[in-house]
UniProtKB/Swiss-Prot annotation:
This is Small ribosomal subunit protein uS5. It comes from the Bacteria. The gene is rpsE. It comes from Listeria monocytogenes serovar 1/2a (strain ATCC BAA-679 / EGD-e). PROSITE patterns: RIBOSOMAL_S5 (PS00585), S5_DSRBD (PS50881). SUPFAM superfamilies: dsRNA-binding domain-like, Ribosomal protein S5 domain 2-like. Disulfide bonds: none annotated. InterPro entries: Ribosomal_Su5_D2-typ_SF (IPR020568), Ribosomal_uS5 (IPR000851), Ribosomal_uS5_bac-type (IPR005712), Ribosomal_uS5_C (IPR005324), Ribosomal_uS5_N (IPR013810), Ribosomal_uS5_N_CS (IPR018192), Ribsml_uS5_D2-typ_fold_subgr (IPR014721). One of its GO terms (biological process) is translation. Keywords: Ribonucleoprotein, Ribosomal protein, RNA-binding, rRNA-binding.
């Protein structure tokens, strides 16, 4: 299992993906609360997401940022892109991530773009294949990122050198 990344020691940038107002219906009317989905990253290979709920929007965002710092993952990169094509799944969400040539930028929509930009991936192409609910898209993207392995990791797992792998 990979080691835990301490989000408090990194210089993180945060991006609010969605804010949703939810209501609890009681005898006297509706009670409103807010949920926030936030992505944090250092644009240098570390990214995480979190959710928070509170009576007021700023409190929900603060809670989401704290949660995101606890859920950080490391993103393996090759130059400015990802090492290989991968499909991330979560619930009904499915995200296809493909490496892109240098200078092509992040071709992704909404929540996926936030995750990839804050992870520090400059060139990548993506396609949403399933549900486009923001939380499912973010979780599917993180799932795809967790599946990424660079050549050194694969060589180590197989007990070979990188040169033997690449032929």
């Amino acid at each position: 299992m990979p080691e835990q990344i301490d989000g408090n020691k990194l210089d993180l940038e945060e991006r609010v993906v969605t804010i949703n107002r939810v209501a609890k219906v009681v005898k006297g009317g509706r009670r409103f609360r807010f949920t926030a989905l936030v992505v944090v990253g250092d644009k240098n290979g570390h990214v995480g997401f979190g959710t928070g709920k509170a009576q007021e929007v700023p409190d929900a965002i603060r809670k989401a940022v704290e949660d995101a710092k606890k859920n950080m993952v490391l993103v393996p990169t090759v130059d400015t892109t990802i090492p290989h094509t991968v499909v991330g799944h979560f619930g009904g969400g499915e995200i296809l991530l493909k490496p892109a040539s240098a200078g092509s930028g992040v071709t992704a929509g909404g929540p996926v773009r936030a995750v990839l930009e804050l992870a520090g991936v400059a060139d990548v192409s993506s396609k949403s294949l399933g549900s486009n609910t923001p939380i499912n898209m973010v979780r599917a993207t993180i799932d795809g990122i967790k599946q990424l392995k660079n050549a050194e990791d694969v060589a180590k797992l197989r007990g070979k050198t990188v040169e033997e792998l690449l032929g």
